[in-house]
Amino acid sequence: MIKEFKEFIMRGNVLDMAVGVILGAALKSIVDSLTKNLINPIISLFVGQVDLSGIAVTIPGTKAVFQIGNFLNDVINFLIIAIIVFLIVKGFNKLRDMGKKTEEEVAEEAAPTQEELYLKEIRDLLANKDHQ
């Protein structure tokens, strides 16, 4: 059972996922800081509050409070992370595609052109003529 678990853990997909989770956690803290220290002050120019988490709406006659500011912070964080992940995936896909040859390129390399066939035929005829 331990051997099976070790094989499972050592597979590339599990290790890739573990690295992704760790990097994702690190990225989240960076994005939180970006939102808090750079984006919120810019938004405060329009809203009037530096800390968006303070924006809330209380329903009259109740104690229910809609924490709109916290929600806006989370939406901003999500959008930033989504854009970063999209750009990373797009970059990796582009690198992967650069390494692959298209089917047409492979077919072109495999099949000799008509000119190459004629040249080989001429070469073979000349070689046979010299040996006779």
UniProtKB/Swiss-Prot annotation:
Entry GO terms, CC: plasma membrane
Keywords on record: Cell membrane, Ion channel, Ion transport, Membrane, Transmembrane, Transmembrane helix, Transport
HAMAP family per UniProt: MscL
A Pfam family it matches: MscL
Major site of localization recorded for this protein: membrane
Name of encoding gene: mscL
Gene Ontology molecular function: mechanosensitive monoatomic ion channel activity
Location in the cell: Cell membrane
TM stretches of this protein: 14-34, 39-59, 68-88
Subunit relationships: Homopentamer.
Gene3D superfamilies assigned to the protein according to its UniProt record, in alphabetical order: Large-conductance mechanosensitive channel, MscL, domain 1
Membrane topology, record value: Multi-pass membrane protein
Function: Channel that opens in response to stretch forces in the membrane lipid bilayer. May participate in the regulation of osmotic pressure changes within the cell.
Species per Swiss-Prot/TrEMBL record: Latilactobacillus sakei subsp. sakei (strain 23K) (Lactobacillus sakei subsp. sakei)
Superkingdom of this protein's organism: Bacteria
Name used for this protein in its record: Large-conductance mechanosensitive channel
Recorded family membership: Belongs to the MscL family.
